[in-house]
Amino acid sequence: MQVLRHSEHTLKTALLSKNPVLVSQYEKLDAGEQRLMNEAFQPRSNLFEPITVHSQSDWISSHPEAPQDFEQFFSDRYRKAPCPKKHIIYIQSIGSLGNTRVISEEYIKWLKGYCEAFFYGLKVKFLEPVSVSETKCSFRVNEHTQNLQIHTGHILAFLKKNKPEDAFCIVGITMIDLYPRDSWNFVFGQASLSSGVGIFSFARYGKDFYTSKYEGNVTSLQLTSPTDYSIFDNYYIPEITSVLLLRSCKTLTHEIGHILGLRHCQWLACLMQGSNHLEESDRRPLNVCPICLRKLQSAIGFNIVERYRALVKWIDDESCNESGATPKSSSEHAHLPKPVEAFKDWREWLMRCIALLEK
């Protein structure tokens, strides 16, 4: 394992900038907000840790990228920020998200609430669900994993065409696996920053995807026609566990972060780190580092302690059931408890941040 540890000077410059105007902006922040963000360059911080690289297959090793500091983010003339006329994050579900209508609806509410807390100050709305056939996307059976996949480029085109006028962005979510081109095995998600659209799949976040017990396998023989979407009827949907909900929240906020102009983080352990595989994605924290937090705050304009309190409230609202998973059928509960036990460590982290902000 390799630990990527930057110097105090490097991290401080990445956060504050060398530009006197941006430094002055930073110095005008609330004292508590400065205290929290200054943790970025504290060697013994117990809130923000260095990035660890565990193998050559990790993102940083296999996808070399130039880092983006706050000044580069702020001065990016191609970056799009929310404005009064375009200030809503729209989420479009594609295909069923749960095994019943009730489960799908509750899952959507949980994701909406999380996004509203994470991007505190922006509105989040869900569009009416659409079927795979309505997108007219290409699809295939993955020759390695034998599961159905839909084409990201075609989905992005569909989303762009149906993007509401007041949308800052529109993101599609699905429980069906994705592929961007024939030569690729899969992709967790894909976004177009210039168009403000993205598509993300949670198919691989189920507990059985990488096991022999996975129930979503099909054969190429079942594909009667490249336009026969009936193969998606009653297609396997993973159970909404607490871990799947956490992974979904991570992916959704990571990708919307990209649409807001945040590139992959290479400063500290951060939600905005790139990930090549599920194990690496699971290592990423739910929180953004101080450098990326300043970027988000600059783009949206939230009060940090209010944002953290909103995230704690999302976790606390509706305690989860003991099993940490949604019921198998809608008849078990008319109103499903939110499975949040996987978020408990993060809640403790948020409370430590709030204490520091209010010190």
Swiss-Prot record:
GO biological-process terms attached to the record: proteolysis
Metal-binding recorded as keyword: yes
Function per UniProt: Probable zinc metalloprotease.
Record PROSITE patterns: ZINC_PROTEASE
Sites where the protein binds Zn(2+) 1: 254, 258, 264
Active-site positions on this chain: 255 (proton acceptor)
Superkingdom: Eukaryota
EC number: 3.4.-.-
Source organism: Mus musculus
A molecular function (GO) term: metallopeptidase activity
Protein name from the UniProt record: Archaemetzincin-2
Tissue expression pattern: Predominantly expressed in testis.
Cofactor note: Binds 2 Zn(2+) ions per subunit. One is catalytic, whereas the other seems to have a structural role.
UniProt-annotated binding residues for Zn(2+) 2: 265, 270, 289, 292
